[in-house]
Amino acid sequence: MQPVCQILDECRIERQTILFSATLDDEVADLVRDYQTNPVTIEVGPKEVSMDSMTHYFWLMPNSKKSTITSEIVRKCGRTIVFCRTRAGADRVGDDLTHDGLAAQVLHGGLSQKQRDRAMARFQHGECMALIATDVAARGIDVEGVNCVIHYDPPENGKAYKHRSGRTARGGSSGIIISLIQKPQRKTVSKIQREVGINVEFTPPDFAQLPEFEVEFIGAPRRRSFGSRNRNESSRKHYGNRNRPQ
């Protein structure tokens, strides 16, 4: 927020200030208090994301299984947004999904605006099955028809959990939220559950729990191969029906 404050400090005192924000958090409230006089607030949409319109799963697994299980979820659920903590993590998951044959796009602050716009356009137009994003880059995403949100890495707090999860269950529809949890993270994630007002058991992955979606498989573009990644596809364990085209 510091650059915004610096700009406002250079503006003349007698002015009209109109503030637009995708979220009304404490930082935005500080801006309103410090730089606006008797402001009128206009909010569009519900004041708070409803956790009741979503089905939440908290799956326990080792870190080594997260990539494979993410691919299986995308094949089962279709249009999915995957949230990662870091840019490098998002790139890695995007590469893993692509090498698993899934069309995926990555969205984070390390990309140019043109690259981010292209990734969003492909996801919005149904040209890929998964969008892998960091929290900052995903602010303001409003895409209809997202069936599932995956917390590949746990969010920082309950507020971030709500914000991420709210990318699905838009416009009164339902949504699936799946958190991929390692045992040492249980205490932190339990605190997040309390903050958002849910109480969900930690379980092993169970694809039979997931609802059936009409999924249109979108494969990754074929690339010329100049070497091997040493990935033995036939030896990998699958956790559900992958809905591969026959």
Question: Would you name each region that the model predicts?
Answer:
Residues 1-221, 244:
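Conserved helicase RecA-like core
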Residues 222-246:
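Intrinsically disordered, low-complexity RNA-associated tracts
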